[in-house]
Amino acid sequence: MTQPAVYVVSDSTGETAELVTRAALSQFGQTPKFIHRFHHVDSSHMIEEIVDLVAVNNGIIVHTIVLESVREELNKTAQAFGVPIIDLFGPLLNQLEETYKIKPLSEPGRVRSMDEAYFNKVAAIEFAVENDDGRNPRGILQADYVLIGISRTSKTPLSQYLALKGLKIVNIPIVPEAQIPDELFEIDPKKIIGLKISKQKLTKIRQERLISIGLPGAGTYASNQRIDEELAIFNKLASKLNCFVLDVTNKAIEETANEILIHIGEIVDENLEL
């Protein structure tokens, strides 16, 4: 088999077409003479120039054109020039449309945008883990939003849930023995979300927690004095920061997260109006 000249054509980046082409060529034990990629092809002028070049060099065209009008024009032009052409997407899109009775979106680059969203989500999850429970106060400056609250207000699971939405979240525990990070006062208060809970619910949760680890009644963790002290510190800090505060009492993680997302959406809308 002689080394082929392959021209990859796409109305997006062309990465998919090139990857498939290289995979196919590997089955023949061949490295192509070259694979030349033409990306973001969306006009008759571009199509004619490309096909003419391929014809002169006795090459073949492999394409993943999504836009139907561009795809049809490329196929017809290649046939007119006698250029071999492989349409990777057309037959598949047509079959899927017939099978599922829905029209394709015809939006180039959707796989790439979905990949970017996936990697952003992974990065957000890693960020949440690295900045969990106040372990890295400097992360506050890089966070999209910061959750503050006393122990047992679901800061960690909420951080992970919001990270799945692609948000970079830091959570900071508010305890009497720990100094409040200076970074909290360096960011926009709109990026801070306080999580409060009723004294009765918190007492019950902490008592159940002590029982679950075999230490019922141990220490001051679930004592009225300790809980009153922590709640007072939180309320004072939230007031000083002038941040949004959400009551998580008797709420599931998903419910609280959705309320946070609604609040975040309101902030975005407000900024767009400015």
UniProtKB/Swiss-Prot annotation:
PANTHER family: PYRUVATE, PHOSPHATE DIKINASE REGULATORY PROTEIN 1, CHLOROPLASTIC. InterPro entries: Kinase-pyrophosphorylase, PPDK_reg. Coiled coil: none annotated. It comes from Listeria monocytogenes serovar 1/2a (strain ATCC BAA-679 / EGD-e). Bifunctional serine/threonine kinase and phosphorylase involved in the regulation of the pyruvate, phosphate dikinase (PPDK) by catalyzing its phosphorylation/dephosphorylation. Belongs to the pyruvate, phosphate/water dikinase regulatory protein family. PDRP subfamily. Keywords: Kinase, Nucleotide-binding, Serine/threonine-protein kinase, Transferase. GO terms for molecular function: ADP binding; ATP binding; phosphotransferase activity, phosphate group as acceptor; protein serine/threonine kinase activity. This is Putative pyruvate, phosphate dikinase regulatory protein 1. NCBIfam families: PRK05339.1 (NF003742). It catalyses: N(tele)-phospho-L-histidyl/L-threonyl-[pyruvate, phosphate dikinase] + ADP = N(tele)-phospho-L-histidyl/O-phospho-L-threonyl-[pyruvate, phosphate dikinase] + AMP + H(+); N(tele)-phospho-L-histidyl/O-phospho-L-threonyl-[pyruvate, phosphate dikinase] + phosphate + H(+) = N(tele)-phospho-L-histidyl/L-threonyl-[pyruvate, phosphate dikinase] + diphosphate. Transmembrane segments: none annotated. Its EC number is 2.7.11.32, 2.7.4.27. It holds the Pfam family Kinase-PPPase. ADP binds at G149, I150, S151, R152, T153, S154, K155, T156.
